[in-house]
Amino acid sequence: MIMQTSSVAEESSAKEVEVKKQVVSNPQLGIEIGLLTGCQDRPYAFGLAMALISKGVDLDIIGGDEIDSRELHTTPRLRFLNFRGDQKKQGNIAMKFWKLLDYYAKLIRYAARCKPKVLHILWNNKVEILDRSILMLYYKAIGKKIALTAHNVNQARRDAKDSWLNRVTLKIQYQLCDHIFVHTEKMKEELCQDFDVVEKAVTVIRHPVNDAFPDTELTPTEAKRRLGLKDDEKAILFFGRIRPYKGIEYLLDAFRLLPADEQAKYRLIVAGEPKKGSEDYLRQIRESVQRDFKEGQVILRIEFLPDEEMEVYLKGADVLVLPYKEIFQSGVLFLAYSFGLPVVATDVGSFREEIVEGSTGFLCQPGDPADLAKAIEIYFNSDLFKNLRVRRQEVKDYAHANHSWHAVAELTYKAYTKMLERNAS
């Protein structure tokens, strides 16, 4: 296991102090919001919460242990309600059922009694069909305004699992929302065309940079050492949940196509835990690695990665590769940018809008290992890689200039005020 970096506590404390300074300097009052996290995606929930609080919004954050952090208990104007607890505890089916039932009961009671007139859903909960229909109808019946961040307009279609019931319940949820946030114009277009959502009820907010993880004084050289790599080895990283639509098999094929005389210098790291239901896909990946590569060429770290280990991978790698078959946008891209790591990605979704070729990364065709291998070669022969120690800061600067949480908070705050104005009238 990778050793924890020594400055994690100091980094977290510094972020907390900065947030408190912003809160004190902004005395604006009057807006109270209930942020429903679905007990997942802590970086997004944390980033949005801190940005909204800096604008003077009072927040209730509803979640579980996976969302929890010290700042959620010490930041002014923020109340963290841990309704879900530890979702990873082992137990029989009956115990899991009762825990889930208890969570929904707490959520229903909260909605009935809470001060916030606006509930902002970041993610649905475990029983999505229930969340999209009955829970939405309940929120509206008790007079709540509903905002929703649709990170994926129709995830089931992307995963080839679409159904009539999925589309109907999605339409119910989208139609009952007072406002919806999406990350790209293409997502807005699909939302309006496929689910008859009115355009003025949708705001496009560019996916913000993911800066919720510690970024210490750890150097790339030290990070490589912790990963078991030599400083002159070229480290290619795939990072994130292991799922079929992410195209890891194409990355393995592309890795085999890299120049034979350079093979000894390349290392591929696949790091992340599998999404439930992706066990067969993971088995195929493991078999391919064992069959087609020499020992040590491909490093599989198939496990949950603690926050303090994120920077080890993102500083130790020389490039992040996203060989996705299909996607609208990816938070992993912006996590890489927050550490100044360039990205090679397939030309799907919004990647063409988010990757500046030659400056923050390169694009290739989806489902084409040869083109992916070519893009990786182009990257390692480019000035972007040859001057990576300097160019990392430029990638960071680009990300914070174009994908700031401040901009997200501005647009989100405006939507909240309009919703409340309509409620008052």
Can you name each region flagged by the protein language model?
Residues 186, 208:
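Carbohydrate-associated surface elements
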Residues 389-418:
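A charged, aromatic-enriched C-terminal amphipathic alpha-helix characteristic of glycosyltransferases
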Residues 342-345, 355:
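Short hydrophobic beta-strand element within catalytic cores of glycosyltransferases
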Residues 282-311:
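Nucleotide-activated donor-binding/catalytic signature segment of Leloir-type glycosyltransferases, i.e.
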Residues 312-328, 341:
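Acidic donor-binding loop of glycosyltransferase active sites
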Residues 26-30, 38-46, 50-103, 108-111, ...:
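N-terminal strand-loop element at the rim of the active site
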Residues 357-358, 362-369, 378-384:
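Conserved acidic donor-binding segment of nucleotide-sugar-dependent glycosyltransferases
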Residues 230-246, 252-255, 268-269:
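Conserved donor-binding/catalytic core segment of Leloir-type glycosyltransferases
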